[in-house]
Amino acid sequence: MKGCRESNEAKESYHVIDPAKNGVTWLFYKGEFKGKLPDFSKLKPAKKGESYNISLKKIDLPGGSYAMQFISNLKIAKAGKYTFYINSNDGSRLFIDNTMVIDNDSEHGARELSSEVELTEGMHSIRADYFQAGGGKVLSVSYSFGNSGKQFIPESLLFKSKE
């Protein structure tokens, strides 16, 4: 047909989340945490909330110094070697099944570190610890598997409990 040309196929993907099941619990701690992450076992959270991902976005945060923990369970569909990434300003650590897999602690500008982790199919606990000593606020956790490329962990794979 004159004036027509073949167009590229448009693709979009959506992740369905269930607010009763999917989510990340975050804990907020007031204080001066200069230089390194605090010992969270000695602190009481000043605030607690829920989000759908491990990120500072969409959380109303004050200026100044504070620390946070993000706690969830990650559903792994296929066993294998996964690469996890944590990007933060200031310090952070990432734990999978209560084992620290990335130590990005100390005061610094936005810096991303990564680590490979062998995971079985099923649910795995995931926790990110973070502190802010002033300046820019950055925290994000992403992963890759096989040829998938690095991506934020889909909200549909983060669960409030292991059930």
Question: Model-flagged regions — what are they?
Answer:
Residues 3-83, 87-163:
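Extracellular/secretory pathway-exposed regions associated with glycan biology
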